[in-house]
Amino acid sequence: MEKNTLIQSPVSLQRRRLLLAGGALLLSPSLALAGAQREETLSDDVASVMRGSINNVNPPRLVFASAQEGERWLSAMSSRLARYVPDEGERRRLLVNIQYEASRAGLDPQVVLGLIEVESAFRQYAISGVGARGLMQVMPFWKNYIGKPSHLFDIRTNLRYGCTILRHYNNLENGNLYRALARFNGSLGSGKYPNAVLGAWRNRWQWG
């Protein structure tokens, strides 16, 4: 698909970024459990609420009772994330975005960290065999329902969509996180994916 030209098309540039970011990600073992959210019909009210969440953009920041607590969290999580993201500055920026987007969606940031580990191993340009994209493996069809054409490989865009979608599923399941996680993965009825996410959370991402 990539052409040998000095001026590359957006598709070829995206292809190059995918390859540079992690090789042949479609074959990566880290994406073995990455599934696909199932396309569904949303009520106008639900779609409106989700669109409002997607479009409400404020600068990311740590959401803690004190700056000291936030710095302790950031330092601890940065050490744990180093195996996936070697650059310290990149780790800290990513963690601030994750903590902010999860918190604003009413989700536990630690569970979201576990989910991202399972979905993409923190690879920004990960893409699954069914087309799910980015850190939280968001299916592109969601843009038609709750957003506008966006670059789902952008870290903040991906986290905003992913956290909004997971919160939607959690609401749909009346706060049952286990079932919400299965819905997020498109595998409702199977415990493999929720157990993997909750296992990653318990083993590597618990806090406090």
Question: Language-model segments: which ranges?
Answer:
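Cleaved targeting-peptide boundary
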Residues: G35-L42
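Onset of an N-terminal alpha helix
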Residues: S12, S43, A47, E71-L74
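N-terminal secretory signal peptides and thylakoid transit peptides that target proteins
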Residues: T5-L25
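Cleavable N-terminal signal peptides
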Residues: A21, A32-L33
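Catalytic glycan-binding domains that act on GlcNAc-containing polysaccharides
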Residues: A36, N56-G208
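N-terminal targeting leaders that direct proteins to extracytoplasmic destinations
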Residues: L42-N56
